């Protein structure tokens, strides 16, 4: 993280090198509309998280089988509990094929919309920010909250 006086931005790993690439701009705009993101920083944060996951999977693949054995299963279980993969027994190659949509699908805003609690993805964001969504009875006001698999069923609408 660096020194306390010079904190580093969390999204720098996900920020593109060439910001004005037309293809990338169109792709980002499409993702922002589909997932109701407020700005590109939210997308870059998701990309940074994905980059961390793929980097870790790549480092595990480069290890020998004996070195990899004690580290691989906890990593896969962590991804499964977070909801990024469907089965904790998937091969590491499958983890490398994850894209940013896997991360964006776990955001509270997206899950509230997919559950049918909101009419649109933007309505879901407004419900969350205004404090009308609770997880296990606790109000969550951050639309970017990554919902773990175990809490997905405990999302409720609070009036």
Swiss-Prot record:
Organism: Pyrobaculum arsenaticum (strain DSM 13514 / JCM 11321 / PZ6)
Gene Ontology CC annotations of this record: small ribosomal subunit
Annotated SMART domains: Ribosomal_S4 (SM01390), S4 (SM00363)
Annotated InterPro entries: Ribosomal_uS4, Ribosomal_uS4_arc, Ribosomal_uS4_CS, Ribosomal_uS4_euk/arc, Ribosomal_uS4_N, S4_RNA-bd, S4_RNA-bd_sf
Entries under PANTHER family matching the protein: 30S 40S RIBOSOMAL PROTEIN, 40S RIBOSOMAL PROTEIN S9
UniProt GO molecular function: rRNA binding; structural constituent of ribosome
Protein name: Small ribosomal subunit protein uS4
Domain S4 RNA-binding: 106-158
Pfam family for this entry, one: S4
TM region positions: none
HAMAP family: Ribosomal_uS4_A
Keyword Ribonucleoprotein (UniProt): yes
Free-text function comment from the UniProt entry: One of the primary rRNA binding proteins, it binds directly to 16S rRNA where it nucleates assembly of the body of the 30S subunit.
Record keyword RNA-binding present: yes
Keywords noted in UniProt: Ribonucleoprotein, Ribosomal protein, RNA-binding, rRNA-binding
Subunit structure: Part of the 30S ribosomal subunit. Contacts protein S5. The interaction surface between S4 and S5 is involved in control of translational fidelity.
Family statement: Belongs to the universal ribosomal protein uS4 family.
NCBIfam families according to UniProt: PRK04051.1, uS4_arch
GO biological process, one term: translation
């Amino acid at each position: 993280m660096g020194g306390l006086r010079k904190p580093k931005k969390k999204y720098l790993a996900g920020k593109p090198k060439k910001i004005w690439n037309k293809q990338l701009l169109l792709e980002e705009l499409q993702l922002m509309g589909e997932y109701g993101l407020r700005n590109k920083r939210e997308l870059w944060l998701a990309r940074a998280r994905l980059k961390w996951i793929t980097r870790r999977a790549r480092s595990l693949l480069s290890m020998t089988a004996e070195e990899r054995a004690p580290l691989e299963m906890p990593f896969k279980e962590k991804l499964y509990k977070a909801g990024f993969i469907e089965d904790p027994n998937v091969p590491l190659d499958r983890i490398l094929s994850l894209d940013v949509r896997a991360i964006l699908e776990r955001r509270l805003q997206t899950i509230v919309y997919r559950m049918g609690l909101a009419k649109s993805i933007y309505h879901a964001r407004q419900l969350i920010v205004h404090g009308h969504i609770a997880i296990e009875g606790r109000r969550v006001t951050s639309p970017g909250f990554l919902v773990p698999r175990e809490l997905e069923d405990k999302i409720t609408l609070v009036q």
